[in-house]
A protein has these predicted regions:
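Catalytic cores of secreted/periplasmic lytic hydrolases that degrade extracellular macromolecules
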Residues: 1-56
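Sec/Tat-exported extracytoplasmic proteins
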Residues: 8-13, 24-31, 80, 120, ...
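Soluble non-cytosolic domains of exported or imported proteins
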Residues: 10-18, 102-105, 141, 176
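Surface-exposed, glycine-biased beta-strand/turn segments
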Residues: 43-129, 163, 176, 224
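Acidic, glycine-rich catalytic/binding loops that coordinate metals and/or anionic ligands
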Residues: 55-64, 159, 185-239
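A residue-level detector for short acidic-glycine micro-motifs
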Residues: 78, 102, 118, 149-152, ...
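Zn2+-dependent peptidoglycan hydrolase active-site motif and core
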Residues: 93-96, 110-157, 179-185
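Active-site-proximal beta-strands of protease catalytic cores
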Residues: 114, 158-173
Length: 240
């Protein structure tokens, strides 16, 4: 997990992870981690690093993934909702997605059986190079997941994609960006055709629960998924 902190951008030096690990070991602070892992192993369970990295097999043989590969958490630089326009401080705008910190890396499909319904290869548009993947639900509703400001796109319209499959590379393309990041947007389309933008944190919370993915989406130290996960737990307890 120390390397997770370093990769996420919290480290201030190249030897951050190794130095922190030495401090933990010298003071015997790793004994609690060992106790937890030994207890899990005695129960036939595996430590959850592979789950945290996104591709997770579930009972119904459907996989789920986060849009980027992380060991413990991903950093969100701008959440869903009203915000100051990053290109004009005098204006407010509705941010219809979340901005995820990236470093020229693969962006991934979040579910199995997704259909690529849109690809934009024009870097000089507001969202730059982008991909939209649609997932059909049993009630005939649909979820559309979009990835903006990409450096490269690896799929084409009509492709079927699976969870964890690389769709392209993150980047800084587009006329409405101030630095590299992944703008991750989610739209829900009801069976009657009604559309609405939803908080991607709510969608990722659902993905995390279904796929048993132990990752956080941190913005200013707060896990954006927590309120949605707590709501689902409360709802489940009420049904029970």
């Amino acid at each position: 997990w120390t390397k997770g902190l370093e990769k996420a951008g919290y480290a201030t030096g190249g030897s951050y992870a190794s130095n922190l690990q030495k401090i933990i070991e010298v003071n015997g602070l790793d004994k609690y981690d060992r106790m937890v892992m030994e207890n899990m192993q005695s129960q036939g369970k595996e430590f959850g690093v592979h789950n945290a990295q996104g591709e997770t097999q579930t009972k119904d043989d459907v996989k789920y993934s986060f849009p980027v590969n992380r060991e413990e958490f991903m950093l969100v630089t701008s959440p869903f909702g009203m915000r100051q326009d990053p290109l004009d401080a005098t204006k407010q705008q509705m941010h219809k997605g979340i901005d995820i910190q990236t470093k020229h890396e693969a962006v991934l499909a979040t579910e199995d059986n997704g259909k690529v319904i849109a690809v934009n290869q024009n870097a000089n548009t507001p969202g730059g190079k982008s991909v939209t993947v649609e997932y059909q639900r049993e009630d005939n509703s649909k979820i559309q997941v979009s990835y903006l400001h990409l450096d490269a796109v690896d799929v084409k319209v009509g492709d079927t994609v699976e969870a964890g499959q690389k769709l392209g590379m993150s980047g800084n393309t587009g006329t409405r960006t101030t630095g590299e990041h992944l703008h991750f947007g989610v739209k829900m389309i009801a069976a009657d055709g009604t559309e609405r933008d939803m908080d991607p944190a709510a969608y990722l919370s659902d993905i995390a629960i279904k796929g048993n993915i132990n990752l956080q989406a941190l913005h200013n130290g707060n896990n954006l998924l927590a309120k949605y996960q707590e709501a689902e737990k409360t709802e489940g307890q009420a049904i029970d």
